[in-house]
């Protein structure tokens, strides 16, 4: 059972997606720029969460120019290149009209660890493991394959809302922890494969949100999955906002709550409450709520 604030977030995401879809096809230059930005941010943040020491600019040099940075481990450079290749594989899988399979997950993992740990790349663990800082104990190595088969069959390709399916896919994969290393990066790639395959955008979990990310994941192990679904949804909403910023026709149809207040008898504080409740069609751009001017004026008229 999802909480009201998660349901409102999902509704907001659906409305935002419909708005972007209504402005398709987007120009090739906008799509190219957005993709380049997403690949960089996704790669940098996902690797940084796992301890990679490359800065975002060093990651950009590695991805775009193949330049290694002095005094940084070769492993960090390989992780950046591997992650970019894994994203390209995920994009390819998302365009194929077949279900996401257990084999696909192993293929993604194989790309993540390529030339870093060839013995375990794409191979399920044959030892028992613990997750650092977590009370959760992953299943015995002997049952990993069976667990993964059941996971692919029951959780992936479900009829849940795409954000819910993506969050559950991520959570269940890290719960099984099927690999010796690379579980987190593989889980985030799988999460976004689910989203992209179902017509959404990748959700980038930021390095700066690492502690919150681990906290909501840990709570999920005790049955409180709603917080993690909300966390994934907010990460996706951040990507949607990047699309809004990049599409002038969309951006020009929205006004700030301060501007909306001048068109009505509502205060900015009250409009902020309405926006958070989902009562008015608003979205958050960075720290500011924006509302559709046309839809807001209709709301005012309907509630006079």
Predicted regions and their residues:
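FIC/Doc superfamily catalytic core
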Residues: 1-181, 185-304
């Amino acid at each position: 059972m999802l909480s009201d604030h998660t349901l409102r977030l999902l509704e907001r995401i659906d409305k935002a997606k419909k708005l972007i879809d209504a402005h398709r096809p987007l120009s090739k230059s906008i799509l190219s720029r957005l993709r380049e930005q997403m690949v960089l941010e996704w790669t940098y943040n996902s690797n940084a969460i796992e301890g990679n020491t490359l800065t975002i600019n060093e990651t950009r040099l590695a991805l775009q120019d193949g330049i290694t940075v002095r005094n940084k481990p070769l492993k960090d450079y390989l992780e950046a290149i591997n992650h970019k290749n894994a994203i390209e594989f995920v994009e390819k899988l998302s365009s194929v009209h077949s279900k996401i399979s257990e084999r696909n997950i192993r293929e993604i993992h194989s790309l993540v660890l390529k030339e870093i740990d060839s013995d375990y790349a794409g191979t399920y663990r044959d030892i028992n493991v613990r997750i650092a800082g977590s009370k959760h104990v992953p299943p015995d190595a002997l049952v990993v394959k069976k667990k993964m088969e059941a996971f692919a069959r029951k959780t992936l390709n479900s009829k849940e809302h795409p954000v819910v399916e993506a969050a559950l896919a991520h959570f269940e994969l890290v719960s099984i922890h099927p690999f010796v290393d690379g579980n987190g990066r593989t889980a985030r790639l799988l999460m976004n494969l689910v989203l992209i395959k179902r017509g959404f955008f990748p959700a980038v979990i930021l390095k700066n949100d690492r502690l919150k990310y681990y906290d909501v994941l840990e709570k999920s192990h005790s049955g409180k999955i709603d917080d993690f679904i909300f966390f994934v949804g907010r990460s996706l909403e951040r990507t949607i906002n990047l699309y809004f910023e990049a599409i002038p026709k969309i951006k020009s149809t929205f006004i700030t709550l301060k501007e909306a207040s001048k068109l009505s008898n509502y205060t900015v504080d009250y409009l902020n409450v309405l926006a958070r409740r989902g009562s008015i069609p608003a979205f958050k751009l960075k720290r500011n709520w924006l509302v559709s001017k046309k839809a807001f004026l209709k709301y005012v008229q309907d509630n006079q």
